[in-house]
């Protein structure tokens, strides 16, 4: 089984220049659930009263999925989560030598003792505990297994494998997660960053290697270059055989809401949700699409509330012109159509813009 634990309201909001208000958070949380998220990570209680109040309002929505907070592995952060009434927590701890040196003076014994104390307290409160392995991709797997073994003994439920600085490749991800998952210590959750454009690919490689869950953010917002995209991971899980019922209305509203609230434009060619990703210009492709809608599309655009189109551009062929002429009631003459193509290519090249059907008619 594979699930999505979306962190748009936590790591997504850590995008520079992004700040969601309470109303936006509530709408995003509800739409994430409706669009198919299995769990939500919704904030950092230790930030203070306003954040805690927002988290309480999200909990008051009574969404039928787990709601999690992000915390440092400290008693103070845990107490802040408990005050909100949360039942699931991520307890973040550095696991790479470089961050352990910076945050714990290289003292792994002190780190493990602190982690143990906080996990014990969290389990005493009957919380779901995810151990967040900060900078896992620069850590030694043997140390990660030591942490996972300790966590399992203390009753922790999950280990979050964080590619904190976004340096993983899909191949390396698969190797590392396969090694960790084969130990059968804790369920593994992927947390990938997009610094080299591989966040979604790495999340999928993690699933393939045995990871149970992955963090995502809507349209891939997040620290620096962002995180694995919710919509991309959601649809990619179908490639792995997961049954997914797409709520296209909720997904479309979710994308629009997050784009507006974060002031992030949705590129027209953004995978899964860009409005032009089902636009076919190449003459060879259009000819194939006229014969079968499966020729050059990975899934039906209507599933996501999108539409296919056949713009009249530089690379258009006779099939495109015939399609558009017929759409306005003109029975095309193939010889005339073929003579039009060079002229259309010249016009489009000069003005850097496709022709409309009405312009073709003229």
PLM features per residue range, with description:
Residues 100, 163, 216-222, 235-244, ...:
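Short beta-alpha connecting loops at secondary-structure transitions
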Residues 66, 160, 213-216:
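Short hydrophobic alpha-helical runs that function as membrane-insertion/retention elements
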Residues 168, 174-291:
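Catalytic alpha/beta core domains of metabolic enzymes, predominantly
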Residues 2-4, 11-40, 57-61, 75-188, ...:
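Alpha/beta enzyme core
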Residues 69, 135-143, 193-198:
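Active-site glycine- and acidic-residue-rich loops that bind
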Residues 2, 244-362:
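A mid-to-C-terminal "edge-of-domain" accessory segment
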Residues 46-63, 69, 74-79:
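N-terminal active-site wall of soluble small-molecule enzyme domains
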